[in-house]
Amino acid sequence: LKILIASDAWLPQINGVVRTYQTLGNKLTSQGHEVRYITPDKFITIPLIIYPEIKLAINHWFKIGVIIEKFKPDFIHVATEGPIGLAVRNYCSKNNYAFTTSYCTKFPEYINTMAKIPVSFTYKILKWFHKNSSAVMVSSNSIIDELNSHGIKRTVKWSRGVDIKAFNPKNKIDLNLEKPIYLYVGRISKEKSLEDFLKLNLKGTKLLVGDGPSKKKLEKKYTDAVFVG
């Protein structure tokens, strides 16, 4: 099968969306499918003012249709609600092409944190964005319930797997850190509200595993915590 994936989030960004679709593409390719990505690196981009790490495509509108018609995919999936995702969504809707979408980030809450835009307003936009999708793929039952409560239907649970070759139980390693250890594993970025955790006066050691745009700043500010990358 020929599968087209459109995503506004891509390398060199470090986040769950990029990792998810990299892994998915590699797995599909290993099974004999042909996977093509429409991502920001194929276009002229500008940095998002409130989050410079995120690059937004600006010259993609007239190229999207050419890419789709040339590739002739059997399936089209829109991973994000950004400029590229919007362009692919609109092209598919206009030309009666079936497509699926994903809801990977709590976008309304994220935008509210970064730019103070009301959550209710963003949910209305998301409802419009996903209304023509054949299926809206989400990671958990709680997110399904949340989206359904805002009128976003045709939600399907798509859980994330774990590469058991890369991640598997090993013998305990003595980190020589004061006990107890409070562990965070994930992206190091503003929307994770990690400062609420790092400010806590706790006996023991705060240990953070992961990377992201806020790592250097937080590592410098909270010297009592251990950042292992």
Segments and roles (model prediction):
Residues 3, 75, 92-110, 137:
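Active-site proximal beta-strand in glycosyltransferases
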Residues 123-170:
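Donor nucleotide-sugar binding/catalytic pocket of nucleotide-sugar-dependent glycosyltransferases
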Residues 215-229:
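Nucleotide-activated donor-binding/catalytic signature segment of Leloir-type glycosyltransferases, i.e.
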Residues 1-43, 71:
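N-terminal subdomain of nucleotide-sugar transferases
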Residues 176-207:
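Conserved donor-binding/catalytic core segment of Leloir-type glycosyltransferases
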Residues 1, 169-181:
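Nucleotide-sugar donor-binding and catalytic loop/hinge architecture
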